């Protein structure tokens, strides 16, 4: 929309509007990814309509307005309002009065805003980039002041209309939520690694990492349908696989190959290394029921209709195998499990086929050497595509001294 707000769903060509606050934040991520894959920022000049106008505007203006909208969509303490839910659309009562805020969405906005600043600089729009930088600093200060739990050592999830904290160490239930900790790393916040350590201590189970803990045991009118589900089921403390996939990216960023392997094994339905899951061994699920569900533990919450598969694909290719698309080419910075001493992947990138072979010694996942068609190249340099050609790339992995 012209305001910068985006709808949640379009089905059969019809817009299905809902009062979820996070819809808009994903636009910048999508555009940034497409431009990096294509290597061509000219997409930003293409014009398209808003949903509520016949006049066309450049794609750049669309994402600028989306970032502006969320920054100005402020509730308590200047954080981003949660409205009728964020990514967790089952927290649908927390912000109906217009005051409740999502610490997670405020953190996610920081990542989107940083990407927008980069996009602005691609087009030489330095004033927009500087404004984004300044706003980013302001929002990060608010998050650290009003979204950090000093006692717990991690980030809160939300503050409701009546300023009831969700995801704080003094809460009786729902003391910690996973997604705030994950995105604090993705957004580059200063205490992200510390938050993740505390999150894993509390949330990890033999079949995956919980979305929240302890699960809510009774309905609460300031939360919503999350607290109406049985403890350990889906949003209410279940093993939700969207965040599990995000965690693969986070563990890769933090250079933790052992936890990457553990996370992959726990997500895959056929792997019983740490615990048994039930369901089709060839499908991805949205969640597993957590251990407190008793004999139902490991049962899928939903299969065949979930974004877990696409999130896992993105995390594995971009972060675990480390294939980072940049304007100049493909930068390789993996965090492979140490047991994967020999593996390979093929990626077609801008009409060029990259055949990439990884050779590890089991000591680490740092890139020690990189060669293209037998010629050594700097390990931290993007490899430019050659249209119509096949590049054979060898990556030597180990532990840097």
Please place each PLM-identified region on the residue numbering:
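Catalytic cores of carbohydrate-active enzymes
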Residues: 108-223, 265, 269-297, 348, ...
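Carbohydrate-binding/catalytic loop surfaces
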Residues: 5-26, 51-57, 77-101, 152-177, ...
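Long alpha-helical scaffolds in large eukaryotic adaptor/regulatory proteins
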Residues: 38, 116, 120-123, 127, ...
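A general structural signal for short secondary-structure junctions and capping/turn motifs
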Residues: 17-20, 35, 60-61, 145-147, ...
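Structured alpha-helical bundle/scaffold domains in large eukaryotic membrane-trafficking regulators
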Residues: 43-46, 151, 328
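Aromatic-rich carbohydrate-recognition surfaces in CAZymes
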Residues: 1-78, 102-110, 237-260, 264, ...
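Non-catalytic C-terminal accessory modules of carbohydrate-active enzymes
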Residues: 201-202, 217, 229-234, 249-401
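Long, well-ordered core segments of solenoidal/helical folds
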Residues: 1-7, 36-38, 50-79, 135-153, ...
């Amino acid at each position: 929309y012209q305001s910068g707000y985006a709808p949640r769903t379009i089905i059969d060509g019809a817009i299905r509007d809902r009062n979820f606050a996070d819809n808009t934040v994903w636009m910048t991520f999508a555009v940034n990814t497409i431009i990096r894959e294509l290597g061509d920022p000219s997409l930003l000049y293409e014009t398209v309509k808003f949903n509520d106008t016949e006049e066309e505007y450049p794609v750049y203006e669309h994402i600028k307005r989306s970032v502006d909208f969320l920054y100005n969509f402020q509730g308590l303490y200047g954080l981003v309002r949660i409205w009728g839910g964020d990514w967790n659309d089952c927290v649908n009562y927390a912000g109906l009065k217009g005051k409740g805020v999502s610490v997670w969405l405020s953190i996610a906005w920081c990542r989107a805003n940083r990407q927008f600043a980069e996009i602005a600089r691609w087009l030489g729009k330095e004033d927009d980039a500087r404004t984004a930088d300044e706003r980013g600093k302001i929002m990060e200060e608010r998050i650290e002041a009003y979204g950090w739990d000093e006692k717990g050592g991690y980030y809160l999830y939300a503050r409701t209309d009546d300023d009831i904290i969700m995801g704080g160490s003094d809460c009786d239930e729902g003391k910690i939520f996973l997604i705030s900790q994950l995105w604090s790393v993705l957004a580059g916040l200063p205490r992200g690694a510390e938050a993740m350590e505390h999150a894993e201590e509390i949330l990890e189970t033999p079949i995956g990492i919980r979305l929240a803990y302890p699960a809510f045991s009774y309905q609460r009118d300031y939360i919503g349908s999350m607290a109406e589900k049985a403890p350990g089921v889906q949003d209410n403390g279940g093993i939700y696989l969207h965040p599990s996939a995000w965690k693969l990216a986070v563990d890769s960023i933090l250079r933790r190959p052992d936890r990457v392997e553990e996370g992959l094994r726990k997500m895959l339905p056929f792997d019983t290394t740490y615990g048994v899951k039930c369901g089709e061994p060839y499908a991805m699920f949205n969640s597993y029921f957590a251990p407190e569900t008793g004999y139902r533990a490991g049962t899928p919450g939903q299969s065949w209709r979930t974004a877990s598969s696409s999130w896992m694909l993105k995390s594995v290719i971009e972060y675990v195998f480390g294939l980072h698309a940049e304007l100049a080419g493909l930068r390789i910075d993996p965090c492979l499990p140490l047991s994967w001493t020999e593996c390979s992947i093929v990626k077609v990138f801008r009409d060029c086929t990259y055949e990439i072979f990884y050779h590890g010694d089991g000591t680490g996942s740092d890139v020690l050497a990189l060669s293209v068609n037998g010629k050594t190249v700097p390990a931290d340099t993007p490899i430019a595509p050659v249209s119509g050609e096949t590049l054979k790339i060898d990556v030597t992995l180990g532990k840097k001294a």
